[in-house]
């Protein structure tokens, strides 16, 4: 090709003119006039918003929320973390149904029983002491003594005892003494069994002959869930879960690092 001459390229045909669609004009009713609201400070009434975040909650609610968040954020040692693994609903229902049969007598029932016994004695029919029926034993000290003497057949511990130090040693003690134990949701549920508001732990010592098979089934299921899994539970730490803000911040940093690396590699 001789110098000074430029190669002529093919001319591209111009794009066809885009045919604009004629939009039909909206008919505006003059009776409906626009009244735009101004939500600035001191202007119109603010719209209804979810202000839960800004409520000044009572102290006990604040504390329980902070405790729940701390349990998520901090590393929770296995001894405390094991109380998050409660018994499944079906087994817990069966257990409570059985425990309901062995509720201790109320103060009124005891009063009536002693009154009837006193009346018999006054009538000269002789005083025959009644045999103590098998009932649930409640309270940390009572249950600890029963476990140490290997008299407890099954120990039920509440998962939400506060302070947790009251019962934190019980699972290890039960395992050492070979007593089956389980952790159940709700100290209030256990409290209802023994006519109190709350209860930390209850224990079965004896049951009637008709309930022995039901208790044996429960003990078998509980033993596989708790006593036999003790080594696994002992290694499992809890918590260490970051909040949404921290997760977002870390994700942002990671994204920036990845972008920087991509530009370096080109």
From Swiss-Prot:
Segments passing through the bilayer: none
Organism: Bos taurus (Bovine)
UniProt keyword annotation of Ubl conjugation present: yes
One GO cellular component, as annotated: membrane
InterPro entries associated with the record: eL8/uL1-like (IPR050257), Ribosomal_eL30-like_sf (IPR029064), Ribosomal_eL8-like_CS (IPR004037), Ribosomal_eL8/eL30/eS12/Gad45 (IPR004038), Ribosomal_eL8/Nhp2 (IPR018492), Ribosomal_eL8_euk (IPR001921)
Keyword hit for Acetylation: yes
Subunit (UniProt): Component of the large ribosomal subunit. Interacts with CRY1. Interacts with DICER1, AGO2, TARBP2, MOV10 and EIF6; they form a large RNA-induced silencing complex (RISC).
GO molecular function: RNA binding; structural constituent of ribosome
Protein name as annotated: Large ribosomal subunit protein eL8
Cellular localisation: Cytoplasm
Superkingdom of the source species: Eukaryota
N6-acetyllysine, modified sites: 34, 97, 217
One of the GO BP terms on file: maturation of LSU-rRNA
SUPFAM superfamilies per the UniProt record, alphabetical: L30e-like
